[in-house]
């Protein structure tokens, strides 16, 4: 489950400009445990919080910026959404992950590549060492102008190295070497989507061998990524969500469904209802295991060796979650 939450939730925008007052961030009844309960009930296998979006506002009291919960009046500047989020995830036995946007429309050093890259590594280190362990770090590739009108050259190898050093088991997703973006925000993979890709091909270099590089399909349950009250009646239908499911999970990809918390700091009742209906529909569709007790056959056997016959396969279906 993706959770887009931040100053945009309160300014009714999708992309903030970094000039918003930290005081606009003021959830009246933040309940991260409610997030986890709803995610577990719907069958999600991971939760990813937007710790910092393009506006640069941090949902933790970062010591590297003045644009964070520390500078807001919410909980007298003592609030920490990331802390409440990871604590709720651990209490509910839900893997926690975070989204961290390299684009920062507030940070003055953005566009001064070496200086900003160190700033970004500092914040990345702060999150990993203060709140870990994390299951995944999700990098957005957006690279617009900063407050000085300059663009930034991201030091991806440095970012990856920091994660590998501090959180070696965490996946690095989207702008990363472990999980790739499917290429759209509609939650739809290509027919025949393969997890085996040419090594280096995504970087524009000559392919040398092949690697395991699965696709992730991100999409929001609403038209927008952040919560907007005007979209309460525009939550995707069960039929639409099922179509997305079969065109993502059914095409060998991970489905990352965004469910944005509202201004109170909770998942909206409208979204909860749709998640409940979606889960019920999936349970009904898959209540009968069509493979149980069926014989296995293979038209091609490795080296024509009967030891590799399909009937000897040890793989089995599991009830593991297939969405994040």
Task: Write out the residue ranges for each language-model feature.
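Mature catalytic domains of secreted/periplasmic carbohydrate-active enzymes
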Residues: 2-314, 318-321
């Amino acid at each position: 489950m993706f959770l887009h939450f931040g100053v945009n939730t309160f300014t009714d925008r999708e992309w903030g400009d970094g000039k918003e007052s930290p005081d606009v961030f003021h959830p009246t009844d933040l309940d991260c445990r409610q997030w986890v309960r709803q995610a577990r009930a719907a069958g999600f296998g991971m939760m990813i919080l937007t710790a910092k979006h393009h506006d640069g506002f941090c949902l933790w009291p970062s010591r590297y910026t003045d644009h964070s919960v520390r500078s807001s009046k919410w909980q007298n500047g003592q609030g920490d959404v990331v802390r409440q989020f990871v604590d709720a995830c651990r209490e509910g036995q839900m893997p926690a992950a975070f989204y961290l946007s390299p684009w920062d429309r507030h940070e003055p050093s953005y566009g001064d590549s070496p200086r900003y890259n160190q700033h970004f590594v500092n914040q990345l280190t702060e999150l990993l060492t203060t709140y870990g362990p994390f299951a995944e770090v999700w990098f957005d590739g957006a690279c617009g102008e900063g407050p000085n009108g300059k663009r930034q050259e991201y030091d991806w190898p440095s970012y990856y190295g920091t994660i590998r050093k501090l959180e070696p088991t965490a996946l690095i997703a989207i702008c990363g070497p472990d999980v790739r973006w499917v290429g759209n925000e509609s939650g739809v993979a290509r027919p025949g989507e393969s997890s085996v890709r040419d090594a280096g091909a995504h970087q524009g270099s000559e392919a040398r061998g092949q690697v395991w590089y699965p696709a992730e399909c991100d999409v929001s349950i609403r038209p927008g990524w952040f919560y907007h009250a005007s979209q309460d009646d525009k939550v995707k239908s069960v039929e639409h969500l099922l179509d997305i499911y079969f065109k993502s999970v059914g095409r060998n990809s991970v489905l990352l469904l965004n469910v944005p918390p509202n201004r109170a700091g909770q998942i909206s009742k409208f979204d909860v209802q749709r998640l409940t209906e979606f889960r019920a529909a999936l349970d009904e569709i898959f209540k009968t295991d069509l493979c149980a007790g069926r014989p296995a056959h293979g038209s091609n056997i490795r080296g024509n060796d009967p030891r590799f016959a399909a009937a000897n396969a040890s793989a089995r279906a599991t009830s593991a979650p297939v969405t994040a």
